[in-house]
Amino acid sequence: ARFNADPARHYEASGCAGKLMVFAVRLDTFPQEKQTAVFYIGTNDINELTDIRRAALGEFESLPVSGEYIHRDAFDIADVYGKDTFYVIKKFGTHQLPKLFDLKARVDRFGKKVSFLPKHFSDKVMQFVSKLLPDHLPKSMRDYRDKYEHHLILKMGGKGVDEARAFLKEYFAHHGGAFFECNAEETQAAMLHRFAVASAAIRYRAVHDDEVEDLVALDIALRRDDRDWFEKLPLEIDNKIIHK
């Protein structure tokens, strides 16, 4: 919920309309949760995710550690075009990414000097290699991909684990969606898959540079009480989009 366009709500950094840069420093001001659990939720009705969000933020005694949404289309793009990112982070960790990005940039600079090499040479090589890698997602996630359009990865800690588990069992006993509690492998896979979504879109553009004009990021501010949050673009715009 943002109020930059509402002068009545201007206070300090709020409503600065780009005239002020705000920096935040993350400090270890509270102990890390010793007990955490990740719940993978699937549904074909966005109202069910809205109910879960409102309950978690308004009724739970323990707030979620995180909540990550994935649409089926994004799931599919990341599955194909984020596979190598998934494996790199799984094997080497995120701390190695800067070195790998630097190597990628050097390869691309070299590729530009060699006339017969294609544009985005490194991306196309890595995409070819990723096709040779084994399947990286658990069967449970693939089953949910086939059954449900909307996915939510909900991470809880401490007392919130039992609280969320009890709520989800009760809620989905009377609704069309479902959930499962992730084991260690599923937890890692779900988080890495969600992480790979953004880079997968960039990879898709690079691999299909003869088809895709560019990426468009839509940053949409919603009111706190909006229940209908799923984007519905005008037909004249929607029919020009390859994937979203």
Which residues does each PLM region occupy?
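Noncatalytic alpha-helical scaffold of FAD-dependent oxidoreductases
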Residues: A1-K244
